[in-house]
Protein backbone atom coordinates (compact mmCIF):
# COMPACT_ATOMS: atom_id res chain seq x y z
CA UNK A 1 0.00 0.00 0.00
CA UNK A 2 2.91 2.39 0.68
CA UNK A 3 4.62 1.83 -2.67
CA UNK A 4 1.37 1.72 -4.65
CA UNK A 5 0.05 4.73 -2.68
CA UNK A 6 -3.25 3.06 -1.86
CA UNK A 7 -5.32 4.65 0.95
CA UNK A 8 -5.32 2.22 3.88
CA UNK A 9 -6.26 2.56 7.56
CA UNK A 10 -4.64 0.08 9.95
CA UNK A 11 -5.80 -0.24 13.57
CA UNK A 12 -3.14 -1.52 15.96
CA UNK A 13 -4.48 -2.30 19.44
CA UNK A 14 -1.30 -2.80 21.46
CA UNK A 15 -1.01 -5.51 24.09
CA UNK A 16 1.81 -6.90 26.19
CA UNK A 17 4.76 -8.38 24.29
CA UNK A 18 7.11 -9.46 22.88
CA UNK A 19 6.02 -12.62 21.05
CA UNK A 20 2.84 -14.03 22.64
CA UNK A 21 3.62 -11.85 25.65
CA UNK A 22 0.62 -11.00 27.79
CA UNK A 23 -2.59 -11.46 25.80
CA UNK A 24 -5.36 -9.06 26.90
CA UNK A 25 -2.87 -6.99 28.94
CA UNK A 26 -1.98 -3.39 28.14
CA UNK A 27 1.32 -2.05 26.85
CA UNK A 28 2.60 0.72 24.56
CA UNK A 29 5.42 -1.21 22.97
CA UNK A 30 4.59 -0.91 19.27
CA UNK A 31 5.32 2.75 18.55
CA UNK A 32 8.77 2.38 17.01
CA UNK A 33 7.75 -0.81 15.19
CA UNK A 34 4.78 0.93 13.60
CA UNK A 35 6.89 3.90 12.54
CA UNK A 36 10.03 2.14 11.34
CA UNK A 37 9.37 -1.61 11.24
CA UNK A 38 9.38 -2.22 7.50
CA UNK A 39 11.84 -3.20 4.84
CA UNK A 40 12.95 -0.05 3.12
CA UNK A 41 11.76 3.47 3.82
CA UNK A 42 7.96 3.35 4.12
CA UNK A 43 6.47 6.67 5.32
CA UNK A 44 3.12 6.32 7.03
CA UNK A 45 0.93 8.44 9.28
CA UNK A 46 0.76 7.32 12.92
CA UNK A 47 -1.85 8.74 15.28
CA UNK A 48 -2.73 7.63 18.81
CA UNK A 49 -6.12 8.37 20.40
CA UNK A 50 -6.00 9.26 24.08
CA UNK A 51 -9.59 8.52 25.10
CA UNK A 52 -12.47 6.36 23.95
CA UNK A 53 -14.07 9.46 22.43
CA UNK A 54 -10.82 10.09 20.58
CA UNK A 55 -11.00 6.54 19.20
CA UNK A 56 -14.33 7.35 17.56
CA UNK A 57 -13.18 10.56 15.91
CA UNK A 58 -9.70 9.25 15.10
CA UNK A 59 -11.17 6.67 12.74
CA UNK A 60 -12.97 9.41 10.83
CA UNK A 61 -9.81 11.50 10.66
CA UNK A 62 -7.69 8.52 9.65
CA UNK A 63 -9.98 7.62 6.75
CA UNK A 64 -10.03 11.19 5.50
CA UNK A 65 -6.25 11.50 5.68
CA UNK A 66 -5.69 8.17 3.97
CA UNK A 67 -7.87 9.20 1.04
CA UNK A 68 -6.60 12.79 0.85
CA UNK A 69 -2.92 11.80 0.84
CA UNK A 70 -3.12 8.30 -0.67
CA UNK A 71 -1.23 6.97 2.33
CA UNK A 72 -1.25 4.31 5.02
CA UNK A 73 -2.59 5.70 8.30
CA UNK A 74 -2.05 3.68 11.48
CA UNK A 75 -4.37 4.29 14.43
CA UNK A 76 -2.30 3.16 17.41
CA UNK A 77 -4.63 2.25 20.25
CA UNK A 78 -4.03 -0.02 23.23
CA UNK A 79 -5.80 -2.70 25.24
CA UNK A 80 -6.91 -0.30 27.98
CA UNK A 81 -8.86 1.80 25.49
CA UNK A 82 -10.16 -1.25 23.64
CA UNK A 83 -11.68 -2.86 26.73
CA UNK A 84 -12.78 0.16 28.78
CA UNK A 85 -16.04 2.09 28.81
CA UNK A 86 -16.45 5.84 28.85
CA UNK A 87 -19.49 8.08 28.37
CA UNK A 88 -19.09 10.96 25.95
CA UNK A 89 -21.52 13.33 24.20
CA UNK A 90 -23.49 11.75 21.39
CA UNK A 91 -21.69 12.62 18.15
CA UNK A 92 -23.51 15.05 15.90
CA UNK A 93 -23.41 13.59 12.42
CA UNK A 94 -21.60 15.67 9.82
CA UNK A 95 -21.44 15.22 6.07
CA UNK A 96 -17.69 15.87 6.40
CA UNK A 97 -17.43 12.35 7.81
CA UNK A 98 -18.47 10.88 4.48
CA UNK A 99 -16.09 9.84 1.76
CA UNK A 100 -16.16 12.14 -1.27
CA UNK A 101 -18.03 10.80 -4.30
CA UNK A 102 -15.96 8.52 -6.48
CA UNK A 103 -14.73 10.45 -9.50
CA UNK A 104 -15.60 8.34 -12.53
CA UNK A 105 -15.00 11.08 -15.07
CA UNK A 106 -12.52 10.17 -17.81
CA UNK A 107 -8.91 10.87 -16.91
CA UNK A 108 -7.68 13.80 -19.03
CA UNK A 109 -5.10 13.01 -21.67
CA UNK A 110 -1.55 13.34 -20.43
CA UNK A 111 -2.35 12.87 -16.73
CA UNK A 112 -0.24 10.11 -15.19
CA UNK A 113 -1.23 7.85 -12.28
CA UNK A 114 1.85 8.89 -10.29
CA UNK A 115 2.25 12.46 -11.49
CA UNK A 116 3.90 13.53 -8.22
CA UNK A 117 3.59 17.20 -7.35
CA UNK A 118 7.13 18.62 -7.05
CA UNK A 119 6.29 20.36 -3.75
CA UNK A 120 3.70 18.24 -1.92
CA UNK A 121 4.40 14.82 -3.41
CA UNK A 122 0.68 14.33 -4.00
CA UNK A 123 -0.75 12.81 -7.14
CA UNK A 124 -4.25 12.19 -8.42
CA UNK A 125 -5.70 8.83 -7.50
CA UNK A 126 -7.06 6.75 -10.35
CA UNK A 127 -9.95 4.49 -9.32
CA UNK A 128 -10.84 1.14 -10.90
CA UNK A 129 -13.10 1.51 -13.91
CA UNK A 130 -12.27 5.15 -14.56
CA UNK A 131 -12.05 5.77 -18.32
CA UNK A 132 -8.46 6.34 -19.48
CA UNK A 133 -7.32 5.35 -15.99
CA UNK A 134 -5.84 1.95 -16.70
CA UNK A 135 -2.54 1.53 -14.85
CA UNK A 136 -0.48 -0.98 -12.92
CA UNK A 137 -0.61 -1.39 -9.15
CA UNK A 138 2.64 -2.87 -7.95
CA UNK A 139 4.87 -3.07 -4.93
CA UNK A 140 7.86 -2.66 -7.22
CA UNK A 141 9.58 0.65 -7.83
CA UNK A 142 7.78 2.40 -10.68
CA UNK A 143 7.78 5.54 -12.78
CA UNK A 144 5.05 8.18 -13.11
CA UNK A 145 3.18 5.97 -15.59
CA UNK A 146 3.13 3.07 -13.06
CA UNK A 147 5.59 1.04 -15.13
CA UNK A 148 8.17 -0.97 -13.18
CA UNK A 149 11.39 1.03 -13.25
CA UNK A 150 14.73 0.62 -11.55
CA UNK A 151 16.12 3.91 -12.81
CA UNK A 152 18.07 5.60 -9.96
CA UNK A 153 16.64 9.07 -10.60
CA UNK A 154 13.05 7.85 -10.85
CA UNK A 155 13.44 5.83 -7.65
CA UNK A 156 14.60 8.92 -5.77
CA UNK A 157 11.69 10.92 -7.17
CA UNK A 158 9.23 8.37 -5.82
CA UNK A 159 10.95 8.18 -2.43
CA UNK A 160 10.92 11.96 -2.14
CA UNK A 161 7.25 12.22 -3.12
CA UNK A 162 6.16 9.68 -0.50
CA UNK A 163 8.18 11.49 2.17
CA UNK A 164 6.94 14.96 1.19
CA UNK A 165 3.36 13.88 1.83
CA UNK A 166 4.20 13.62 5.54
CA UNK A 167 5.69 17.12 5.49
CA UNK A 168 2.63 18.43 3.64
CA UNK A 169 0.32 16.92 6.26
CA UNK A 170 2.45 18.32 9.09
CA UNK A 171 1.93 21.85 7.77
CA UNK A 172 -1.85 21.44 8.23
CA UNK A 173 -1.66 20.34 11.88
CA UNK A 174 -1.95 22.54 14.97
CA UNK A 175 0.29 22.43 18.06
CA UNK A 176 -0.84 20.05 20.81
CA UNK A 177 -2.72 21.71 23.67
CA UNK A 178 -0.95 22.19 27.00
CA UNK A 179 -2.80 21.16 30.16
CA UNK A 180 -1.74 23.90 32.58
CA UNK A 181 0.77 26.70 32.06
CA UNK A 182 2.94 26.88 28.95
CA UNK A 183 6.06 27.52 31.05
CA UNK A 184 7.16 26.10 34.37
CA UNK A 185 9.27 23.59 36.25
CA UNK A 186 8.02 20.27 34.88
CA UNK A 187 6.24 19.13 31.72
CA UNK A 188 4.80 15.62 31.54
CA UNK A 189 4.38 14.31 27.99
CA UNK A 190 2.25 11.33 27.07
CA UNK A 191 0.54 9.59 24.19
CA UNK A 192 -2.28 7.09 23.82
CA UNK A 193 -4.25 5.69 26.75
CA UNK A 194 -2.15 7.36 29.47
CA UNK A 195 -3.92 10.68 28.94
CA UNK A 196 -6.48 10.39 31.73
CA UNK A 197 -3.98 9.25 34.35
CA UNK A 198 -1.48 11.97 33.47
CA UNK A 199 -3.99 14.82 33.47
CA UNK A 200 -5.61 13.69 36.73
CA UNK A 201 -2.21 13.50 38.43
CA UNK A 202 -1.14 16.89 37.04
CA UNK A 203 -4.40 18.47 38.20
CA UNK A 204 -3.78 17.18 41.75
CA UNK A 205 -0.20 18.46 41.75
CA UNK A 206 -1.23 21.87 40.42
CA UNK A 207 -3.88 22.04 43.13
CA UNK A 208 -1.07 21.66 45.66
CA UNK A 209 0.83 24.55 44.12
CA UNK A 210 3.36 22.70 41.97
CA UNK A 211 4.43 24.22 38.62
CA UNK A 212 3.53 21.14 36.59
CA UNK A 213 1.88 20.94 33.17
CA UNK A 214 1.29 18.21 30.62
CA UNK A 215 0.78 17.77 26.91
CA UNK A 216 -0.52 14.75 25.06
CA UNK A 217 0.54 13.95 21.50
CA UNK A 218 -2.02 12.62 19.04
CA UNK A 219 0.10 12.68 15.88
CA UNK A 220 3.34 10.78 16.33
CA UNK A 221 4.28 10.73 12.65
CA UNK A 222 4.42 13.42 11.51
CA UNK A 223 4.68 15.22 14.84
CA UNK A 224 2.62 18.34 15.29
CA UNK A 225 4.29 21.76 14.92
CA UNK A 226 5.23 23.74 18.00
CA UNK A 227 6.33 20.80 20.15
CA UNK A 228 9.91 22.00 20.41
CA UNK A 229 8.82 25.41 21.68
CA UNK A 230 6.56 23.75 24.27
CA UNK A 231 9.35 21.48 25.53
CA UNK A 232 11.82 24.36 25.84
CA UNK A 233 9.41 26.29 28.06
CA UNK A 234 10.08 23.95 30.99
CA UNK A 235 13.10 23.26 33.14
CA UNK A 236 12.43 19.51 33.13
CA UNK A 237 10.56 17.32 30.65
CA UNK A 238 9.56 13.72 31.28
CA UNK A 239 7.44 11.24 29.35
CA UNK A 240 5.10 8.76 31.03
CA UNK A 241 4.69 5.63 28.92
CA UNK A 242 3.70 1.98 29.03
CA UNK A 243 6.85 0.64 27.38
CA UNK A 244 10.29 -0.30 28.64
CA UNK A 245 13.03 2.10 29.70
CA UNK A 246 16.16 1.30 31.68
CA UNK A 247 16.41 2.53 35.26
CA UNK A 248 19.27 5.06 35.44
CA UNK A 249 19.88 3.91 39.01
CA UNK A 250 20.81 0.40 37.90
CA UNK A 251 24.57 -0.16 38.41
CA UNK A 252 25.00 -1.38 34.83
CA UNK A 253 23.25 1.59 33.25
CA UNK A 254 24.84 4.86 32.20
CA UNK A 255 24.23 7.37 29.41
CA UNK A 256 26.21 5.29 26.93
CA UNK A 257 23.88 2.28 27.15
CA UNK A 258 20.61 3.46 28.67
CA UNK A 259 17.48 2.58 26.72
CA UNK A 260 14.96 5.39 26.81
CA UNK A 261 11.23 4.90 26.29
CA UNK A 262 9.92 5.14 22.74
CA UNK A 263 8.51 8.67 22.80
CA UNK A 264 11.36 10.02 24.92
CA UNK A 265 13.87 8.73 22.39
CA UNK A 266 11.96 10.33 19.51
CA UNK A 267 11.68 13.69 21.29
CA UNK A 268 15.35 13.70 22.29
CA UNK A 269 16.42 12.95 18.73
CA UNK A 270 14.17 15.47 17.00
CA UNK A 271 14.22 18.45 19.36
CA UNK A 272 17.60 17.98 21.12
CA UNK A 273 15.95 18.50 24.50
CA UNK A 274 17.04 16.49 27.56
CA UNK A 275 13.81 14.51 27.88
CA UNK A 276 13.71 11.95 30.69
CA UNK A 277 11.17 9.15 31.01
CA UNK A 278 9.22 7.13 33.53
CA UNK A 279 7.66 3.88 32.40
CA UNK A 280 5.67 0.95 33.70
CA UNK A 281 5.13 -2.39 31.95
CA UNK A 282 3.03 -4.31 34.47
CA UNK A 283 0.32 -5.26 32.01
CA UNK A 284 -2.23 -2.92 33.52
CA UNK A 285 -3.20 0.71 32.88
CA UNK A 286 -1.00 3.33 34.53
CA UNK A 287 -2.90 4.84 37.45
CA UNK A 288 -3.15 8.54 38.35
CA UNK A 289 -1.81 7.84 41.84
CA UNK A 290 1.30 6.23 40.39
CA UNK A 291 2.03 9.25 38.20
CA UNK A 292 1.29 11.56 41.13
CA UNK A 293 3.78 9.75 43.36
Q: Residue spans of the language-model regions?
A:
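Thiamine diphosphate
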Residues: 1-36, 45-66, 207
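A broadly conserved detector of short glycine/acidic/proline-rich loop/turn motifs that flank catalytic sites
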Residues: 12-15, 38, 50-51, 79-80, ...
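Short, conserved catalytic or adaptor-binding loops enriched in Gly and charged residues
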Residues: 33-40, 267-271
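Glycine- and acidic
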Residues: 41-48, 183-186
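Flexible, low-complexity linker and terminal segments
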Residues: 58, 63-293
Amino acid sequence: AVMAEIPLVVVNVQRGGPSTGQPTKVEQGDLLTVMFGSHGDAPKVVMAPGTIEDCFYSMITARRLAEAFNMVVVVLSDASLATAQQPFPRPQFSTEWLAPPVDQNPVPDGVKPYDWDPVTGLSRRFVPGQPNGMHTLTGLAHDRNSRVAYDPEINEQGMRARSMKLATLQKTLTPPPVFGDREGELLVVGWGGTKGAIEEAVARLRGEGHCVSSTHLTFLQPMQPGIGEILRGFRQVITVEGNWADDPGDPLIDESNRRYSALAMLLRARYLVDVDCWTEVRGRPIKPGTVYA
